[in-house]
């Protein structure tokens, strides 16, 4: 069940507002469609536009009257479950609520929740580790700390906050307890991106950044014959591109590269050969691959272009330079200077 009202205060009409290239609710519907455990997907809404979007995705729509917004999600779930039972649903069937305001939740989280229910969980909730130095107030207003020692956040004990992204139980458990939160409870920990719940425009701005950031892979090495210039340039590029999903790829036997990047906070992946790099690129499907390891072969670059939107190579005198989307080199002047938006 994806409950989606037409009205919202913090971000007006947020469920139909376009995030990147599609309405916000489409992100969650597509995640649900990608869940192997999802047999029936229902968008519960009071809004014609939301209903139309859901129908275009091919999922079921259940309508409700416009409310004051004081209705709880358990109230909505009660209506949907009542209808499902009339249509032949069984008490053992999993019932999963997925919030449309959590656009980065992954479909496999729904599948994971259903599997946990099959294995005896009463409820399954997605949570994010939100440990901080927190305070509360006593009944008389006196501040009280909720920690024992003032230490760095990473050293505090885990403290989990519900994301609201996924809450799962069975129809039978809901009938018996009249709530979606039933013991024994299992927690599925997600990262900060999946945990994002859009309430205000500040959240929306974060969502726009997450939706539009690029995936970048830098292939580089250092060594006695190669020197260190390549890794220093890769470091400069990495620092400029750090706001994107960045991965530095080095050879497993390149000890100098390993030691160099161990001093810096970037994700480094080691590969054994070109085949391993191709396999990594095929799985990652990056927006951009940057090559900085001298002369490349034409077939090498052509293979990488099958997996990436663009391939850029540096100081490359090999045949692969002709196949790359862009060559950056101080070794010679361009015979034809390409300028303008199409070449940026």
Descriptions of predicted regions:
Residues 73-79, 102-191:
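Conserved core of the sugar-phosphate nucleotidyltransferase
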Residues 181-206, 323-343:
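A nucleotide-sugar donor-handling region in carbohydrate enzymes
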Residues 223-225, 233, 239-240, 251-338:
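Active-site and donor-binding regions of nucleotide-sugar-utilizing enzymes
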């Amino acid at each position: 069940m994806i409950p989606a009202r037409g009205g919202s205060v913090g971000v007006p009409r947020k469920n139909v507002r376009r995030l990147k290239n599609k309405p916000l609710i489409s992100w969650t519907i597509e995640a649900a469609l990608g869940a192997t455990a999802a047999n029936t997907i229902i968008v519960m809404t009071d809004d014609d536009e939301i209903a139309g979007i859901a129908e275009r995705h091919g999922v079921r729509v259940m309508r409700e009257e416009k409310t004051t917004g004081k209705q709880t999600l358990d109230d909505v779930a009660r209506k949907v479950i009542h209808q499902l039972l009339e249509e032949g649903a069984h008490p053992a069937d999993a019932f999963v609520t997925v919030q449309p305001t959590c656009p980065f939740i992954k479909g496999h989280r729904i599948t994971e929740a259903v599997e946990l229910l099959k294995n005896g969980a009463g409820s399954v909730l997605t949570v994010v580790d939100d440990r901080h130095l927190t305070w509360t107030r006593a009944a008389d207003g006196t501040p009280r700390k909720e920690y024992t020692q003032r230490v760095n956040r990473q050293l505090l004990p885990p403290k989990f906050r519900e994301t609201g992204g996924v809450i799962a139980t069975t129809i039978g458990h809901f009938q018996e307890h009249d709530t979606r939160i039933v013991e024994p409870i299992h927690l599925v920990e997600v990262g900060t991106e999946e945990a994002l719940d859009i309430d205000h425009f500040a959240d929306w701005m974060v969502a726009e950044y997450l939706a539009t950031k690029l995936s970048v892979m830098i292939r580089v090495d250092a060594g006695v014959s190669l020197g260190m210039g390549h890794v220093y340039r890769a470091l400069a590029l990495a620092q400029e591109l750090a706001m994107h999903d960045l991965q530095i790829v080095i050879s497993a036997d390149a000890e100098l590269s390993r030691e160099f990047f161990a001093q810096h906070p970037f994700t480094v992946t080691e590969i054994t050969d070109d085949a391993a790099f191709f396999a990594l690129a095929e799985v990652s499907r990056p927006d951009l691959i940057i090559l900085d390891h001298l002369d490349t072969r034409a077939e090498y670059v052509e293979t990488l272009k099958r997996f990436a939107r663009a391939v850029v190579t540096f100081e490359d005198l090999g045949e692969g330079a002709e196949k790359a989307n862009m060559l950056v080199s101080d070794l010679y002047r361009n015979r034809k200077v390409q300028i303008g938006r199409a070449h940026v």
